[in-house]
């Protein structure tokens, strides 16, 4: 498969993720769309690394996955706290948190 096709797929995945972040109100769906955007960036990093014949993009993608794993832990904990206090995971309810 042509490497440019992977870049097109990466752009498509990133666009779908960005549209989901902007259009959806459910915090879990927004969270999944952010993860989709991170995976699209990882695909682009690995594709560029493959095209240029070095490992820098693959190493950067690995570190991005490590940061994304930490983001999952913190993000889901915050979503659970919002759900316990508001009984909803809507993004609109999250801006009302004070305590």
Curated annotation (Swiss-Prot):
Gene Ontology CC:
NADH dehydrogenase complex; plasma membrane
Please report which protein family the annotation says this sequence is part of: Belongs to the complex I subunit 4L family.
Tell me its EC number(s), please. Answer: 7.1.1.-
Q: Keywords on this record?
A: Cell membrane, Membrane, NAD, Quinone, Translocase, Transmembrane, Transmembrane helix, Transport
**Top class in the EC scheme:** translocase
According to its record, how does it sit in the membrane? Multi-pass membrane protein
- The entry's protein name is NADH-quinone oxidoreductase subunit K
The UniProt catalytic activity note for this protein reads: a quinone + NADH + 5 H(+)(in) = a quinol + NAD(+) + 4 H(+)(out)
Q: What's one Pfam family here?
A: Oxidored_q2
- Residue stretches spanning the membrane: 3-23, 28-48, 62-82
Sorted alphabetically, the Gene Ontology BP terms of this entry are: ATP synthesis coupled electron transport
Q: Which residues form the signal peptide?
A: none
* Matching NCBIfam families: PRK05715.1-2, PRK05715.1-3, PRK05715.1-5
Q: Could you tell me which Gene3D superfamilies the record lists for this protein?
A: 1.10.287.3510
Q: What does this protein do?
A: NDH-1 shuttles electrons from NADH, via FMN and iron-sulfur (Fe-S) centers, to quinones in the respiratory chain. The immediate electron acceptor for the enzyme in this species is believed to be a menaquinone. Couples the redox reaction to proton translocation (for every two electrons transferred, four hydrogen ions are translocated across the cytoplasmic membrane), and thus conserves the redox energy in a proton gradient.
Q: Which organism is it from?
A: Rhodococcus erythropolis (strain PR4 / NBRC 100887)
Primary localization class, coarse: membrane
